[in-house]
Amino acid sequence: MEVSMPLPQIYVEKTLALIKPDVVDKEEEIQDIILGSGFTIIQRRKLHLSPEHCSNFYVEQYGKMFFPNLTAYMSSGPLVAMILARHKAISYWKELMGPSNSLVAKETHPDSLRAIYGTDELRNALHGSNDFAASEREIRFMFPAVIIEPIPIGQAAKDYINLYVAPTLLQGLTELCKEKPPDPYLWLADWLMKNNPNKPKLCHFPVTEEP
């Protein structure tokens, strides 16, 4: 009996990002920075969490002195939740946000998002998952219907590269040798962009506000 094997897949790390209530009006600016930093926004929703939902989301902070203020702040108005994807999404998003205390960020990382948009330690504009386990939990919390795929290891990634990346790259290098452009790096980059067989189609998702 012939067994049909599924095609290998490649997965990109994902993280949860929140634009907090007091900077929701800066969403478009912040998203432009996110996209310009190499992230893809996989999912996006605008919602208003109740204090109870905020308590459940920040359950690991329960019992700390700032917990009541945190839940009050996060439930004070609508926020924007996004699933961001790219290579090493969790660490890159944390780096782009900067230190959790916006006052510190303004001193040590003045170009970070929390330095630009945050106010203080509590009102720090943005949230990001701390690690992979937190990312899985937080994405499920904000996007219950999303299926989180495992990160590939070893052979699955190699199979994907051999089947889908290597042929296109080889064709590009062959064309490069024929063309002999003055700037081969720029030419190849441009060729790969134009001939990417997996080039995504731009989808415009409707913006919905939830109570």
UniProtKB/Swiss-Prot annotation:
Coiled coil: none annotated. CDD domains: DD_NDKH5-like, NDPk5. Keywords: Cell projection, Cilium, Cytoplasm, Cytoskeleton, Developmental protein, Differentiation, Flagellum, Hydrolase, Spermatogenesis. It comes from the Eukaryota. Expressed in the trachea, ependymal cells and oviduct (at protein level). Expressed predominantly in germ cells of the testis. Not expressed in testicular somatic cells. Belongs to the NDK family. This is Nucleoside diphosphate kinase homolog 5. Its main location: other. Its EC number is 3.1.-.-. Does not possess all residues considered to be crucial for the NDPK activity.
